[in-house]
From Swiss-Prot:
The lineage of its organism: Eukaryota, Metazoa, Chordata, Craniata, Vertebrata. This is Apoptotic chromatin condensation inducer in the nucleus. One of its GO terms (molecular function) is ATP hydrolysis activity. Ubiquitous. The Ser-1180 phosphorylated form (by SRPK2) is highly expressed and phosphorylated in patients with myeloid hematologic malignancies. Residues 1176-1193 have a biased composition (Basic residues).
């Protein structure tokens, strides 16, 4: 196929070379390691691997494909299905179908293994060379190419249709990482993993590889998704894969998976398992991302179609032809020693990148920018990566989308694009280097590099350039690597590298010890390749940084476009917003795929770091074309590699730990980190925000990794820091310096972990680098190559950066060791002197907050401005000081930290420095190691405290240039640390104690009168008396008899032989944290003898002062510590107390004897409860104590008597001692006693009778009285009733009267009425009688 279908992966050639290593690399899994193992196994591949006898032999063997050494026919159906599932292939069908399917996949994998990266870009041509015997594969590849072309055309059409929709959706996805941080870990990892796929540039192979591992876990769901994503990837990747149906792609992926599976099985390291998990997650996420990418790719494909049609996605064969040419050319260049060519190619690439960037910048429309970038990057990548056109096309489009911001950032940042391209390519190339070292396949390496870089169009272009440049580097390295290639081929080296890779990821989890073990192996393997590893580490650093920086730039471009990107960035962000939406989702997926890559890169990172070192060394060696460009590209590639390593570390964490939020924060941080890189133009606060999430995430991840590889990686990180600051350091430093106040604490942690986003990038780069650097730096101490690059980087950075940025880098460096406190001690143990470098340089990047250490510690360092001079001075210092320099840096940071904590706690930070005890440092490392570890811990704890004094940090920054000051301080601290060293040097007893962590610069003035008795309160367990006394004995000679500590070890009274010792102890211990887990700060104050005597039980009453205080005077803030005894206010009380003291002294001694006897069987906790209980219960402590003292005296007397008795206790003794009345032990009564008792009983009975009678009489009387009362009550009731009856009668009478009156009134009224009626009648009759006679008369008349 094209480079085995992986050509599409920028690791296509790498995929071929690495046998899916590209995929593996893309998947960011241990694939690199897996394929490295394979590559190592593979003999040096001639420029045409196809001609490789082993390849042809293996290809011939493809007919007899074996899985894990077993013929497919011999495998069970379940095994076949599992293998198919791993490869994401269909598991349905008869066994013969399964065997066929798996065979095809394995053959493809073998092809990928053996296809030469530099061979003609056409897989067919390669196959013709490699597999002229295998006509099946030829047909297969031809078919795939045809299908890929058709699909690409189709997808280009679809992409054109979906472009707008996807652009809109991608606009929403503009900050996929930012979003990713908000998304569930799966989504985040999926987002990252698509990027990983892109970065793998074997979208499918990476997915298929990740699917190999992932399918087994999430095979079924992921399969479909992967297949859909693979279909998309295949469409994009079928240009590179030779247009093959999804199954064919799966088959191809299956080979890659088989390769990976085999390599994994060969390596079968935990890393691989972790990587597999990560890949599974990546695959899951890639599937989602692939779908997203498909939509993104659709527009990208559309654009790519527009541009890629111009480059007709450069027919795979043409692209392959171009690539083979490019690769063969690159290989030739590499063989020539490519550095000179590198600079030329870098110039060309920078010109191309600049032209592309200018085009992009000129092109306001995202599509135009994307198209131009895609065209240029596709042209470059298709020429150099034609094997990976499909995904490369998509990747290029996405990368171009991403690269638009990246290029814009790189344009703004200057030639970084070229170097970024180169650098971005170098990460693959470094892998190739490692691969080439493993298998001096220099030619393939460029192709692989190119293929790996596709995720970023700029990265693609850069990878083309870088691949060429890398080819040159590889050429330069190839001579070096060729010998070491053989060594690398040697399983030992394979194991170290591969193991280092897994370990890097695992150590990301915290397998420091494993990494130490592997680091030695890496060192061993690295030692065979010291120069190469370093160079490779440099190349890888550059490459990864370039890759990371493109992704960072993408992210930065996204953020910057969203934040304060310049007009170019804004245009690009506008253009890129759609393209970034696609490309940011894709680039987020890329960067995430990079992060898987970075995990893969981490697995490869040792090699990469070495290659970075090589690239850096070359960058420094070729400062002409590279110093600034190289440094920038290195910083870019490192930032990218950091983002990868961050996302990778986060991915590995995700897969390894539920720290998905870290990943999201990591991916988000990555997004922010790029912003920081591009936010050089953006506001510093965004950087702070960026830095904090990143650095915290990356700090955790990078702290782990950085701790593993912190030493070498620190150097690389410093280079990266310098290089990266070139991009964003001027503004970043300014921004961060401006930011520190606002985000001082957050950034301090970040700055401590990585003073800047750069430092965090550095951390991540360091993670990758550290992984490499564990090998590389181990070699470095020999070669010190990274160190010169660091000065060069510093120079470049100094050119590009303001001094503040340099100081920030110094902070990073100095804080880097802090970041890796634990790592440092680990490194110190494993690496010794190199540990110094990593401590100084890498210690900080991955530094995790120690238990009990303030989080602010890590956050506040960014405020320190590191000047270029200071960086230069620090770097040279670090080089000579290896161990101490780390100490110096740590101490510089420590001083800052202590200052911060001092501001916070108001306590003496210097003491912390001196007092901080590094449990980690328990191992007897050179003073440097101990001091470093201790300082690291101190720093951790001081950092929270020292963080507040960000301004002092600035002064410290100023001091950083003269690290000697910090060294002096730190060394002094180191001395104190050594003095405090975990082993009691005085006693010779190896008591491991933590050095107290100074919280304040200067202890607050004592409350009590200075005396030789020191009262230390706020003690919090866990610690042992021996540890406490060891701590106290550091500053003076304890009077053992006068030492008192309460039962719960919350406070103690220490009596020193002299007041000076007491003063020294208070100065050393006041306001420090000890043990480190103590959430409180120790309060050391002077106490009076009375106070001590009282607590020792010699005084019944508290000192009068204490009493008065208890009565009304507020006691000091430390209630446990009695207020420093002042001369008793009342002489009488004093006398009384003295008498009591004398009495209680004796009583106390007796009590102590009793206690010792009693408490032998008592548990400490119970004893504490028993003794402390009464105090806590009673309100009046004085009363309680007095009573207790008395009761204790009595008890002690009784107990003493009991003690006098023979040990064999008689029943009588036991009985007499019992307080209860045990019936069992009543002795029989004598007759007299019986008589007496009988008489007593009779008397008692009589008395009882009398009492009964009396009681009865009384009761009778009572009853009579009660009856009397009852009678009276009855009478009363009767009387009341009578009264009430009388009243009722009277009322009735009255009512009757009233009724009679009423009746009478009525009668009267009636009578009157009748009378009226009568009168009226009479009147009428009279009037009639009168009138009638008149009539009669008249009538008569």
């Amino acid at each position: 196929m094209w480079r085995r279908k992986h050509p599409r992966t920028s690791g296509g050639t790498r995929g071929v070379l690495s046998g899916n290593r590209g995929v593996e690399y893309g998947s960011g899994r241990g694939h690199l390691g897996t394929f490295e193992g394979r590559w190592r196994k593979l003999p040096k591949m001639p420029e045409a691997v196809g001609t490789d006898p082993s390849t042809s032999r293996k290809m011939a063997e493809l007919e007899e494909v074996t899985l894990d050494g077993k013929p497919l026919q011999a495998l069970r159906v379940t095994d076949l299905k599992a293998a198919l599932e791993q490869r994401g292939l269909a598991k349905s069908g008869q066994k013969s179908a399964l065997v066929k399917r798996l065979k095809g996949a394995l053959m493809l994998e073998n092809l990928q293994k053996h296809s030469t990266p530099h061979a003609a870009f056409q897989p067919n041509s390669q196959i013709g060379e490699e597999m002229s015997q295998n006509s099946f594969i030829k047909q297969y590849l031809e078919k795939q190419q045809e299908l890929l072309r058709q699909r690409l055309e189709r997808e280009a059409r679809e992409a054109a249709e979906l472009e707008e929709a996807s652009a809109e959706s991608e606009d929403e996805m503009i900050h996929p990482e930012g979003v990713a941080s908000l998304l569930p870990p799966d989504f985040q990892s999926s987002l990252e993993r698509p990027e990983l796929e892109l970065s793998r540039h074997s979208p499918r192979k990476s997915s298929s590889i990740s699917e190999e591992k992932g399918d087994s876990d999430d095979e079924k769901p992921r399969k479909g998704e992967r297949r859909s994503s693979r279909v998309r990837q295949a469409r994009a990747a079928k240009l590179s894969e030779g247009s093959q149906p999804a199954e064919e792609e799966e088959d191809q992926e299956t080979p890659s998976r088989n390769l990976r599976v085999r390599a994994d099985r060969n390596l079968k390291t935990e890393e691989e398992e972790e990587e597999e998990e990560e890949e599974e997650e990546d695959d899951e996420e890639e599937e989602g991302d692939d779908e997203g990418q498909k939509s993104r790719e659709a527009p990208i494909l559309k654009e790519f179609k527009e541009e890629g049609e111009e480059i007709p996605r450069v027919k795979p064969e043409e692209m392959m032809d171009e690539r083979p040419k490019t690769r063969s050319q690159e290989q030739e260049v590499l063989e020539r020693g490519g550095r000179f060519t590198r600079s030329q190619e870098e110039a060309r690439k920078s010109h191309l990148a600049r032209q592309q960037q200018e085009k992009e910048m000129k092109t306001t429309s995202p599509l135009e920018e994307e198209e131009r970038e895609i065209k240029s990057s596709q042209g470059l990548k298709e020429k150099s990566k034609s094997p990976s056109p499909p995904r490369l096309t998509e990747d290029r489009k996405k990368a171009s989308l991403v690269a638009l911001p990246e290029q814009t950032a790189s344009e703004e940042e200057t030639p970084p694009p070229l170097l970024t391209k180169e650098a971005s390519s170098p990460p693959p190339h470094p892998q190739l280097h490692s691969e080439e070292e493993i298998e001096p396949m220099e030619g393939p390496a460029p192709a692989v590099l190119i293929q790996l870089s596709p995720p970023n169009t700029d990265a693609d272009t850069r990878e083309l350039l870088v691949s060429q440049h890398t080819v040159q580097l590889v050429g330069g390295l190839s001579p070096l690597s060729s010998p070491s290639d053989t060594k690398a081929e040697s399983p030992a080296e394979k194991v170290p590298e591969e193991s280092v890779l897994p370990l890097v990821q695992k150590s990301t989890l915290a397998d420091y010890s494993a990494q130490k073990d592997l680091e030695p192996e890496s060192d061993r393997s690295a030692q065979p390749l010291p120069l190469k590893i370093e160079e490779l580490a440099l190349a890888k650093g550059i490459t990864e940084e370039c890759l990371k920086q493109p992704s960072l730039e993408q992210k930065e471009g996204r953020r910057a476009s969203h934040t304060l990107l310049p007009s170019h960035r804004l245009k690009q962000s506008a253009d890129s917003s759609s393209s970034r939406s696609s490309s940011s989702s894709s680039s987020s997926s890329r960067s995430r795929s990079r992060s898987p890559d970075s995990s893969g890169s981490r697995s490869h990172s040792p090699l990469r770091s070495k290659q970075r070192d090589v690239a850096q060394a070359r960058t420094h060696a070729n400062p002409r074309g590279r110093p600034k460009m190289g440094s920038r590209s290195t910083s870019e590639s490192r930032s990218r590699s950091r983002s990868r390593s961050r996302s990778a570390s986060s991915n590995s964490r995700k897969s390894l730990s539920p720290g998905v939020s870290r990943d999201s924060s990591t991916s988000y941080t990555e997004t922010k980190d790029p912003s920081s890189g591009q936010e050089v133009a953006t506001p510093p606060v965004p950087q702070l925000q960026v830095c904090e999430p990143k650095e915290r995430t990356s700090t955790s991840s990078s702290s782990v990794q950085a701790r593993r590889l912190s030493q070498p990686e620190s150097a690389e990180k410093h280079v990266t820091q310098r290089l990266q600051p070139e991009r964003g350091s001027p503004k970043k430093c300014e921004a961060e310096e401006a930011e520190p106040p606002a985000a001082t604490q957050p950034q301090t942690s970040e700055t401590q972990t990585s003073h800047l986003p750069e430092s965090e990038r550095i951390h991540h780069t360091v993670e990758e680098k550290e992984e490499v650097t564990m090998d590389t730096s181990e070699n470095r101490p020999e070669n010190d190559v990274p160190e010169p690059p660091m000065p060069i980087a510093d120079q470049v950075s100094n050119d590009d950066r303001p001094e503040g940025s340099v100081e920030d880098e110094e902070k990073k460096e100095s804080s880097l060791p802090k970041s890796f406190k634990r790592k440092i001690s680990v490194v110190s143990a494993t690496k010794g002197v190199p540990a110094g470098n990593s401590d100084t340089e890498g210690g900080q990047p991955g530094r995790k907050r120690r238990w009990g250490a303030s989080t602010a510690t890590t956050q506040k360092k960014p405020s320190i401005s590191i000047t270029t001079e200071s960086l230069k001075s620090l770097i040279p210092d670090i080089k000579p000081l290896a161990g101490q320099e780390a100490v110096v840096d740590l101490h510089a940071d420590d001083s800052r930290i202590s200052e911060d904590e001092t501001e916070r706690n108001g306590d003496d930070g210097t003491h912390d420095k001196g007092l901080k005890i590094c449990r980690t440092v328990t191992q007897v490392v050179p003073a440097e190691g101990q001091e470093n570890g201790q300082r690291e811990e101190e720093e951790e704890e001081k950092e929270p405290e020292a963080e507040p004094p960000v301004p002092p940090q600035v002064s410290v920054e100023v001091a950083l240039p003269p690290p000697a000051e910090h060294e002096v301080k730190k060394v002094t601290l180191g001395d104190t640390l050594t003095r405090r060293s975990i082993s009691q040097q005085k006693s010779g007893v190896s008591i491991t104690i933590d050095d107290p962590v100074r919280t304040a610069q200067v202890p607050s003035p004592p409350r009590g009168k200075i005396s030789n008795i020191v009262h230390i309160s706020n003690l919090v367990r866990p610690f042992t008396l021996g540890q406490l006394k060891e701590l106290l004995g550091r500053t003076g000679t304890l009077v053992e008899e006068a030492f008192w500590i309460d039962k719960i070890k919350s406070h103690c009274f220490v009596t020193y032989s002299t007041v000076e010792e007491a003063v020294a102890t208070r100065t050393a211990l006041h306001g420090v944290k000890w043990p480190q887990s103590n959430p409180k700060f120790l309060c050391a104050d002077y106490a009076e003898q009375d106070e001590l005597d009282y607590h020792r039980g010699l005084l019944v009453d508290r000192p009068s002062e204490t009493k008065t205080e208890e009565q009304g005077i507020p006691r000091p803030l430390h209630p446990p510590p009695p207020p420093p005894v002042q001369p008793p206010q009342h002489p009488r009380a004093e006398q009384r107390e003295q008498e009591r003291a004398v009495r209680e002294q004796w009583a106390e001694r007796e009590r102590e004897m009793e206690r010792r006897e009693r408490t032998r069987s008592e548990r400490e906790w119970d004893r504490d409860k028993v003794r402390e209980g009464p105090r806590s219960r009673s309100r009046s402590r004085d009363r309680r104590r007095k009573e207790r003292a008395k009761s204790k005296e009595k008890k002690s007397e009784k107990k003493e008597k009991a003690q006098e008795e023979p040990p064999a206790k008689l029943l009588d003794d036991l009985f007499r001692k019992t307080k209860a009345a045990p019936c069992i032990y009543w002795l029989p009564l004598t007759d007299s006693q019986i008589v007496q008792k009988e008489a007593e009983r009779a008397e008692r009975a009589k008395e009882r009778e009398k009492r009964r009678k009396e009681q009865e009489e009384e009761e009778q009387k009572e009853r009579e009285k009660e009856a009397e009362r009852e009678r009276n009550r009855q009478l009363e009731r009767e009387k009341r009733r009578e009264h009430s009856r009388e009243r009722d009668r009277e009322r009735e009478r009255e009512r009757e009267r009233d009724r009679g009156d009423r009746d009478r009134d009525r009668e009267r009224d009636r009578e009157r009425g009748r009378e009226r009626d009568r009168r009226d009648t009479k009147r009428h009759s009279r009037s009639r009688s009168r009138s009638t006679p008149v009539r009669d008369r008249g009538g008569r008349r």
